[in-house]
Amino acid sequence: MRVIPVSTGKASTPTPIFDTKVFTKYRAVTLRGRTYTVPGVPYTICVSANEAICMHAAPWQENAGKAFGVPRSNGCVRIPLAHARWLFENTPKGTPVSIQA
């Protein structure tokens, strides 16, 4: 078992609670939303078929000294870089994922 600190969606953009699986993986990808574009997001694992909800590294959060474990995202699950890399390398497509409160 591995415990990984994460940051999920803010109250205004909550992360959905659901059972799913890994659909797609990107070593680096540009994430886009209505109010943001973030290029080069590393170790991205998408857990919704439309790629709207993903788990990914958030180096900008680490670089700003903002702790994980606090809701900060626009719906995705943000993970510290080292943990995101481990998860990316050890989670094949099709792996079951359960996102809980």
Regions found by a protein language model. Give the residues of each.
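Exported/periplasmic cell-wall-interacting domains
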Residues: 13-19, 24-101
